[in-house]
Structure formats: structure tokens, C-alpha cells
């Protein structure tokens, strides 16, 4: 439970539909162009374009459903998530544990789970929500981050990736890795914040698919504290759907019987 509550937001938002673009029409990646990307700002702008930043401007809401598994514990469950106008709602259902929910209505954040009950998100947790729930458009990074630093090219699996350290206006730094060929985001390192403290988390994004002109990672694999593996596989992603505004608001406390 500690792991789930600490990484719930990071997993859901970082692996949510990323604002992206239509793939290049050339027969093979223009490596000569990629080689000219020498600054963090240039890479972030190029990545946003490659993943569909133009199409993302037409998106007002996104609703996603996914399967969630924690192999080491033999846990398999379901997850649903809604993002609209910088508001966020997520629900994870795990057999034997129950429902884990988290929400943000644009100002206030809250969480509810079988162990901690219903509570407000404050301090570092709330700052994390505010940072991650905003549009994931790399070209717009200056609205969410105060600093972007190019660390160089790193190997992520079999791919070569630009490593960029992004420092939010509030909260700790994150390192994002962009494939040098596709410019897609393929890994994110961050320290997730939860009710029990801070937990280092590595999230790998893959199985990108074109949805409404945007490239969306349909699979994420997260390594928590270097040992625990959490896999999320999206089964359905829909954009510009009607959203019930009430789901973002903190639930009322049920009277004790």
C-alpha cells in the first residue's frame, strides 16, 4: 500500500496521453537534424512537435482505462483516469486491497484509500499534483519548470536518449529521457511523494500509438525504490468526451453508523 499511494499520481499522470504530433513523413529518421539539437530548449520543443503539440491544442479532456499489475505481489487490477482543464481524477481497483482514489479540482487535491481514509493533499504532495496535472507539452516547459539542463545522451534499453533534468517551480527535479531518433519520451525519473514519504521511481514509456493526432504511450513500466515493478497497460483512451465535473471534487465524509 505504501508503494501504491506514493506513486499513484506519478504513474497515472506521467503515463497519461502526452501532447504530441504527427510522425515525420520521411522514410527514415532525419538523424542529421537530430544531431543539431544541442540545447535542452531545442530538444523539448522538437519533442513536443514530434509527439503532437499541434493536435493537442484541440483536446479539452481525456479519459483513459488501463490494466495494472504488480508481478512480485501477484496483484492485478484496473485503473481509470480523467484529465480536463488541469483537473485530475484517478481510481485504482485492486482485489484484496480495495479502491484507491486521487483527485484535483484545480485548487484542492485529495486522496482516499482503505488504510488512510479520505485526506487532503498538502505540501509536497499537492505541489506534485499541480506540477504533473498540467499539460504535458514539452514546448511549454517554462510554464511548469524553472530550469532545464541537458545532461547528455544516455542509453535507455537499446535506445539512445537525450537526458534532460527539469526542475519544477515547486518540488524536486525530474530527469526526462527522449529517444534521439523519434524524440518520444521513453523514461522519466522522479521522486514520488506520498503520505509515508519520498520514493524514487523510474518510469519507462513504450508502445506509442497515434490517437487523434497525438502519440500516446499505451504501456508504462515503473521501478519503485529500485526493486518493485508496476506495469500499466492502457486499453482505451478517448479525447474530448463529456466529463462529470463532480468527480474532481473531494468526496463528502460518510457519517459513521
Predicted regions and their residues:
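Gly/Pro-enriched, hydrophobic low-complexity segments
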Residues: 20, 93-95, 160-251
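A short, sequence-level motif marking secondary-structure junctions
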Residues: 81-87, 105-108, 125-127, 179-182, ...
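Bacterial Sec-dependent signal peptides at the C-terminal "C-region" and cleavage site
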Residues: 15-23
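Flexible, processing/modification-adjacent segments and terminal tails
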Residues: 22-45, 49, 108-172, 180-182, ...
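Positively charged n-region of N-terminal signal peptides that target proteins for export
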Residues: 1-5, 21
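Bacterial N-terminal signal peptides
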Residues: 6-15
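Catalytic loop of the DD-peptidase/beta-lactamase superfamily, centered on the K-T-G motif
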Residues: 100, 107, 116-121, 224-230, ...
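N-terminal mature ectodomain segment of secretory-pathway/periplasmic proteins
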Residues: 35-36, 41-117, 145, 149-151
Amino acid at each position: 500500500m505504501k508503494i501504491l499511494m506514493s506513486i499513484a499520481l506519478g504513474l497515472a499522470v506521467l503515463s497519461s496521453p502526452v501532447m504530441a504530433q504527427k510522425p515525420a513523413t520521411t522514410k527514415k529518421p532525419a538523424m542529421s537534424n537530430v544531431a543539431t539539437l544541442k540545447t535542452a530548449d531545442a530538444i523539448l520543443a522538437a519533442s513536443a512537435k514530434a509527439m503532437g503539440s499541434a493536435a493537442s491544442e484541440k483536446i479539452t479532456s481525456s479519459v483513459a482505462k488501463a490494466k495494472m499489475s504488480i508481478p512480485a505481489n501477484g496483484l492485478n487490477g484496473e485503473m481509470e483516469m480523467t484529465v480536463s482543464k488541469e483537473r485530475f481524477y484517478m481510481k485504482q481497483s485492486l482485489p484484496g486491497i480495495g479502491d484507491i482514489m486521487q483527485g484535483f479540482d484545480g485548487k484542492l487535491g485529495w486522496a482516499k484509500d482503505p488504510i488512510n481514509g479520505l485526506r487532503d493533499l498538502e505540501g509536497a504532495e499537492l505541489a506534485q499534483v499541480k506540477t504533473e496535472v498540467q499539460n504535458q507539452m514539452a514546448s511549454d516547459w517554462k510554464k511548469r519548470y524553472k530550469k532545464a539542463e541537458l545532461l547528455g545522451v544516455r542509453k535507455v534499453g537499446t535506445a539512445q536518449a537525450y537526458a534532460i533534468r527539469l526542475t519544477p517551480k515547486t518540488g524536486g527535479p525530474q530527469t526526462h529521457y527522449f529517444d534521439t531518433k523519434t524524440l518520444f519520451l521513453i523514461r522519466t525519473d522522479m521522486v514520488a511523494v506520498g503520505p509515508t514519504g519520498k520514493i524514487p521511481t523510474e518510469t519507462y514509456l513504450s508502445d506509442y500509438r497515434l490517437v487523434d493526432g497525438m502519440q500516446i504511450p499505451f504501456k508504462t513500466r515503473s521501478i519503485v525504490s529500485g526493486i518493485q515493478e508496476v506495469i500499466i497497460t492502457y486499453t482505451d483512451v478517448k479525447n474530448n468526451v463529456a466529463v462529470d465535473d463532480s468527480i474532481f471534487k473531494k468526496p463528502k465524509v460518510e457519517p459513521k453508523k
